[in-house]
Amino acid sequence: MHTVLTRGNATVAYTLSVLACLTFSCFLSTVFLDYRTDANINTVRVLVKNVPDYGASREKHDLGFVTFDLQTNLTGIFNWNVKQLFLYLTAEYQTPANQLNQVVLWDKIILRGDNAVLDFKNMNTKYYFWDDGNGLKDNRNVSLYLSWNIIPNAGLLPSVQATGKHLFKFPADYATSSI
């Protein structure tokens, strides 16, 4: 006969193997789902100022101010394998110095069970919209889009971009009044 330790080891090893197979099966049940949804983004107010960036240097850089509206329904994304969503609004633009600039302006965490219908009006950005030069003034091709990371119970950590983005332009003159 086998000892108690040998039987215990076999039982624990078998249990862990079954749990690993179940976890993988659970992951497979949601890996091919489409997590995209529509997002309506609109800019309400857009300003650009040329101010010193004391965090990086004393040179003047462009600082953008964007007020936006955001409407989307994320309830269809939640299933048994979605623990939470990490949403973030990104601005993407080109300058003569850089082909691709991406700046995260706003973020939010939505837990399972929270209200996943977003209807925000006149929202200010959560983070500063700094450019590393003077590339915001009169920039006519800035796009805003909503993305999210899905935090699952088991499996991959997908990054998903919403369908629909908003294009806007910065004014040709710097704002002189205080914001």
UniProtKB/Swiss-Prot annotation:
UniProt-annotated location(s): Endoplasmic reticulum membrane
GO process annotations (BP): protein targeting to ER; signal peptide processing
Keywords: Endoplasmic reticulum, Glycoprotein, Membrane, Signal-anchor, Transmembrane, Transmembrane helix
Keyword Transmembrane helix among record annotations: yes
A Pfam family the protein falls into: SPC22
Gene disruption phenotype: RNAi-mediated knockdown reduces infection by West Nile virus (WNV) and Dengue virus type 2 (DENV-2).
Assigned protein family: Belongs to the SPCS3 family.
Role: Essential component of the signal peptidase complex (SPC) which catalyzes the cleavage of N-terminal signal sequences from nascent proteins as they are translocated into the lumen of the endoplasmic reticulum. Essential for the SPC catalytic activity, possibly by stabilizing and positioning the active center of the complex close to the lumenal surface. (Microbial infection) Plays an important role in infection by flaviviruses such as West Nile virus and Dengue virus type 2.
Listed name of the protein: Signal peptidase complex subunit 3
Organism, as annotated: Drosophila melanogaster (Fruit fly)
